[in-house]
Curated annotation (Swiss-Prot):
InterPro entries to which the protein is assigned, alphabetical: DEFL (IPR010851)
Keywords: Antimicrobial, Disulfide bond, Fungicide, Plant defense
Disulfide bond entries: C19-C62, C29-C49, C34-C56, C38-C58
Protein name according to UniProt: Defensin-like protein 123
GO BP annotations listed: defense response to fungus; killing of cells of another organism
Domain of life: Eukaryota
Annotated Pfam families: SLR1-BP
Organism per entry: Arabidopsis thaliana (Mouse-ear cress)
Length: 64
């Protein structure tokens, strides 16, 4: 899985500022590699596949 990252956006959620970043992949997203990629890049990173089949969506605290 070779990601190309796209600049993240910021949004507010229950008083905590969260950011997110999409990784555009060359192969279909797989759950565990997506989770691992996000948590290795961002200490508070949580990764899920989607919204497109070749994307990994990371959510993390902007204050990291």
């Amino acid at each position: 899985m070779r990601p190309r990252s796209r600049a993240g956006d910021k949004f507010m959620s229950q008083g905590q500022e969260l950011c997110h970043e999409y990784f555009q992949l060359t192969a279909p997203c797989e759950k565990q590699p997506c989770i691992d990629m996000c948590s290795s890049k961002y200490k508070t990173g949580k990764g899920v596949c989607g919204p497109a089949v070749h994307q990994c969506f990371c959510t993390f605290s902007c204050t990291v």
